[in-house]
């Protein structure tokens, strides 16, 4: 789910390049069951990303292996500093990485949880259904 943290990240990344391509994982939960599945279709998410003025193109991928292969065709990769000491797909690819500061507390998982918690009880009582 897009939140202001993503917009800030795209703006920051775009300041380093002329063309910003965003890689969109179709469903991260297929390879990482601990991840929540996307709420919106890949087509809807791609349309939203393309409407952001800092994003020039979006490529989608189903498997981490495909994303790994995409990376070999790009000059620069942008990652949040929260990934610096961890593992991430393509760590072995010889590509320049620009580490973007994540100076916010936004989280897609937290946003999904907040939405769930805000509608759970009213929906159990039958509200929200037309």
State what each model feature region is.
Residues 1-130:
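Nucleotidyltransferase catalytic core that binds NTPs
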């Amino acid at each position: 789910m897009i939140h202001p943290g993503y917009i800030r990240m795209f703006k920051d990344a775009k300041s380093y390049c002329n063309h910003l391509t965003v890689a969109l994982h179709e469903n991260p939960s297929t390879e990482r069951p601990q991840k929540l599945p996307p709420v919106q279709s890949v087509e809807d998410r791609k349309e939203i990303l393309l409407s952001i003025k800092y994003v020039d193109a979006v490529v989608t991928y189903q498997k981490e292996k495909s994303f790994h292969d995409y990376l070999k065709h790009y000059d620069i990769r942008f990652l949040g500093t929260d990934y610096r000491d961890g593992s991430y797909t393509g760590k072995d690819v010889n590509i320049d990485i620009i580490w973007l500061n994540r100076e916010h507390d936004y989280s897609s998982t937290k946003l999904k949880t907040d939405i769930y918690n805000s509608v759970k009880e009213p929906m159990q009582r039958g509200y929200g259904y037309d």
